[in-house]
């Protein structure tokens, strides 16, 4: 007997769009001389004493085993001819905004997961197009024609399958998973490909002899619940292609922040305040983008010895004024005890967010 009822809504039309090696692709687009060469977005370890991590890399660099979150030093060791680019995140944000505007032509039910991926529910779309595959192809065409970048698309009746489908054929792929094909599609996948199944869960599943979707499908519900608790039921549903999570166009953000890690330690107050200012302006811009205001400003400081301090101040009124955020963050820094160690990271975050209110001054 099932512990939890199985309800499978297969009537929806969900698209998952994932930009192909987004940051690196933007750099290649803007500098054609990079095409065909291994490009890594991250600090050049030869200039930072080996510090830094890879943000992302293009497909040419991935041939050498380079991947995001790898240390820049290891990336260089794997591919000494790789071209390291620090990255221009303001430019990437601008391009991301351009792509989101393309999504909005087709549906307002868009759930951005990051700057380079999003879910779209096109069940009831603006153009009245019945085929989700046709919409996915149109979006790919529009992004290529107007932005000069490629993306991969997954189409299915839920978010779980759509995301798996977008990963199936990259770059510039389009994969459709119909309800009648879902079990066959999942059966062939390694369990570590299932989104939402973390490393520890994968190890535990392997210990149970579960390596593929087919293996998972054969395990009784109670066995999974005994081993994983409520997550066991989620696994039971995933193996059957069941996921009714809605595309949330109004995802609730609890905070908006900006932080930077410095290859060269900061010692001078003028340099520190200048970086606080940059972060504050970035936070103000993000608040503007997301039509949010906030009340609590948080400053994060990490020193050379990796001691990390965070301190917050709650304002009497909501704001997204860059000058005010900068002033408060600067005052917080002034209130901290002096530390002779240089600073390796500074971050400014706004919490206690609310939607924009018309009669509040929003000057940046």
UniProtKB/Swiss-Prot annotation:
UniProt-listed Pfam families: IMS, IMS_C, IMS_HHH
Keywords from the UniProt entry: Cytoplasm, DNA damage, DNA repair, DNA replication, DNA-binding, DNA-directed DNA polymerase, Magnesium, Metal-binding, Mutator protein, Nucleotidyltransferase, Transferase
Co-factor requirement: Mg(2+)
Localization (cell): Cytoplasm
Active site residues according to the UniProt entry: 117
GO cellular component: cytosol
Known EC number: 2.7.7.7
Residues engaged in binding Mg(2+): 18, 116
Residue ranges constituting the UmuC domain according to the UniProt record: 14-198
Chief location: cytoplasm
Gene3D superfamilies membership: 3.30.70.270, 3.40.1170.60, 5' to 3' exonuclease, C-terminal subdomain, DNA polymerase, Y-family, little finger domain
Site feature (Substrate discrimination) residues: 23
Listed GO biological process terms: DNA-templated DNA replication; error-prone translesion synthesis; SOS response
Catalytic activity, reaction form: DNA(n) + a 2'-deoxyribonucleoside 5'-triphosphate = DNA(n+1) + diphosphate
Gene Ontology MF terms: damaged DNA binding; DNA-directed DNA polymerase activity; magnesium ion binding
Comment on bound cofactor: Binds 2 magnesium ions per subunit.
Similarity-based family: Belongs to the DNA polymerase type-Y family.
Assembly description: Monomer.
The protein's role, per its UniProt record: Poorly processive, error-prone DNA polymerase involved in untargeted mutagenesis. Copies undamaged DNA at stalled replication forks, which arise in vivo from mismatched or misaligned primer ends. These misaligned primers can be extended by PolIV. Exhibits no 3'-5' exonuclease (proofreading) activity. May be involved in translesional synthesis, in conjunction with the beta clamp from PolIII.
PANTHER family: DNA POLYMERASE KAPPA, DNA REPAIR POLYMERASE UMUC / TRANSFERASE FAMILY MEMBER
Protein name: DNA polymerase IV
Highest classification ranks of the organism: Bacteria, Bacillati, Bacillota, Bacilli, Lactobacillales
